[in-house]
A protein has these predicted regions:
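Bacterial N-terminal signal peptides that target proteins for export
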Residues: 2-12
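Secretory/extracellular carbohydrate-interaction modules
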Residues: 75-190, 365
Length: 366
């Protein structure tokens, strides 16, 4: 006869405790995962305007509207102990967007507007954390990054505004300057050129005396990691710019976007004649400049340093290190740009229209 003993109260207690511990551990792990998920801070949590943009990554891809999105190579958030920041990062070499030679991690506005009827505004507060460690010091674009733009979506797709930050190796202070690029007259855009205006520090034209020698450091420049703010407003054809930074003089500028001042070669500034004429960029501008062309804002990190030989273009081709596009090696050796944005805003009028044509034309990886 088989005798079945009832489990002792002690054994039952052990089983219950074991089950309870196992269940508790599982719930604890699930809770940790949930907390971790909740603690992820996205760019759209930091600056609440991302529904108005598409995002181009440093590998040339357009990821669309970047709500609740991050990419640890190019676009994510950081906290510096006081504030959350949106990080834009792009290597010297890799796949690019559209026809550009340069990589970017950059927002592009979903809508476009026309300068003559515009009432648009973009603002941003940022700090540049890194520019390329290498590049030919006689090339004006070397060690620079564009952190804000107005871009044309039509015809030549030129840029009435690019806001630059540039700092040379060994310098404590860098320069902030802005460019106006002409909207070249006619169908041939090869003669296009930029005019550079200093905000703090030097303008674009100040370069090293040789490929491995840097120029003098600017006295009133902006350091890596130092905050500054820009405000860009376009209203009734006039672009107004304001630049602010603690401890620096506030600077303001205006530029007419619908009436050119560069109708003949005699009108072209001396800076441009010295910088661009030697490489064949000596065009003149349409009389009405950017009137009638759809324009839009851009914001982020548009790397101006690349690996192309300076023999191709003495102003824009840096001959910098790219490790054949190996992003990890570029990041490890300082051959990239990194820009942190703390805040930003976008004012959009009721005159805007879809910018989808620009994206459909340029959304390809080279």
């Amino acid at each position: 006869m088989n005798v079945h003993k009832k489990p002792s109260l002690k054994l039952i207690a052990i089983i219950l405790v074991t089950f309870s511990v196992a269940t508790g551990c599982k719930k604890s792990e699930e809770k940790k995962q949930e907390i971790k998920k909740q603690e992820t801070v996205y760019a759209s949590d930091v600056i609440p305007f991302f529904e108005h943009w598409k995002l181009i990554l440093g590998d040339g891809t357009n990821v669309g509207v970047p709500l609740n999105f991050e990419n640890k190579d190019y676009f994510y958030t950081e906290n510096d102990g006081e504030n959350n920041w949106v990080v834009f990062k792009a290597p010297n070499g890799g796949n690019t967007h559209g026809t550009s030679n340069n990589t970017r991690t950059e927002l592009a506005q979903l809508k476009k507007w026309y300068p003559k009827t515009a009432n648009e505004k973009m603002t941003a507060t940022l700090k540049v954390m890194n520019v390329s460690a290498t590049g030919d010091e006689t090339v004006a674009a070397t060690h620079s990054v564009v952190v804000g733009q107005i871009h044309s979506a039509d015809k030549h797709e030129n840029e009435p505004l690019k806001i630059f930050y540039k700092i040379y190796p060994g310098h404590k202070k860098g320069s902030v300057f802005w460019h106006y690029e002409i909207n070249t007259k006619g169908d041939d855009n090869s003669g296009r050129w930029d005019f550079s205006t200093a905000v703090w520090g030097h303008d674009f034209s100040i370069v090293g005396p040789s490929a491995d020698e840097v120029p003098d450091e600017p006295k009133d420049g902006i350091a890596l990691g130092e905050e500054f703010t820009y405000e860009v407003e376009v209203k009734n054809g006039i672009m107004s710019l304001t630049f602010k930074s603690k401890g620096h003089e506030t600077k303001t500028f205006t530029k007419n976007l619908i009436e050119s001042e560069y109708l003949t070669k005699a009108d072209i500034p001396k800076q441009t004649q010295e910088l661009f004429f030697p490489i064949g960029q000596d065009g003149v501008e349409r009389k009405n400049a950017y009137e009638g062309e759809g324009c839009f804002f851009k914001l982020g990190a548009y790397n101006q340093t690349n690996g192309k030989s300076p023999e191709v273009n003495r102003n824009w081709c840096s001959g910098a290190e790219t490790f054949n596009g190996d992003v990890a090696k570029q990041y490890k050796t300082g051959n990239y740009v990194e820009v942190w944005f703390k805040s930003g805003s976008l004012k959009i009028s009721d005159k805007v229209v879809s910018n989808e044509g620009y994206f459909s034309k340029n959304d390809k990886v080279k």
